[in-house]
Amino acid sequence: MNEQEPAPKRGRRFKEQTPVQRALGLLVRREHSRKELNRKLLARGIEPDAAQAAVDRLTGEGWQDDARFAAAVVRNRAGSGYGPLHIRAELGTHGLDSEAISAAMATFQGDWTENARDLIHRRFGEQGPIDLPQRRKAADWLARRGFDGNSIRAATRFDLED
């Protein structure tokens, strides 16, 4: 057998992507906050000044928008069964200020108490928690998912007489 050298690969040669192209590649997949986008660019070895300039440019051109990102997070997390306290905390970790968080929370069209009830019905069946230990378990579970006390009481039918 003849040993042959492998043929040179044909095809496109990829040029090194600019910071703006890398950031745009991230934004095409899903929304990102400014802080998250900057952090991801830095993790990919882009210089801090270039990363910040890329984020500023994409924000100025409308590709990145913290309000749009926050509304998407609220919609996604509420649909996944998380309550308002959990969602607010998550938005805070993305570097959003309290005004942006409040505006995003106002975009939610549903009812937090109804969401909590739906979760309880899915977890405990149509009858819901029957006795006090089950109600406590349900209340603890909702609290861990970020629901407030009023929603928890309404969803678990928790009365002070119990």
From Swiss-Prot:
Cellular component terms (Gene Ontology): cytoplasm
Keywords of the record, alphabetical order, are:
Cytoplasm
Q: Return the Pfam families for the record.
A: RecX_HTH1, RecX_HTH2, RecX_HTH3
Query: This protein's superkingdom?
Result: Bacteria
InterPro entries hit by this protein: RecX_HTH_1st, RecX_HTH_2nd, RecX_HTH_3rd, Regulatory_RecX, WH-like_DNA-bd_sf
**GO term, biological process aspect, one:** regulation of DNA repair
Where does it primarily localize?
cytoplasm
Compartments in which it is found: Cytoplasm
- Taken from the UniProt record, the cysteine pairs bridged by disulfide bonds within this chain are none
Which PANTHER family does its entry note? Answer: REGULATORY PROTEIN RECX FAMILY PROTEIN (PTHR33602:SF1)
In UniProt terms, what function does this protein have? Answer: Modulates RecA activity.
The family note in this entry says: Belongs to the RecX family.
- Return the protein name: Regulatory protein RecX
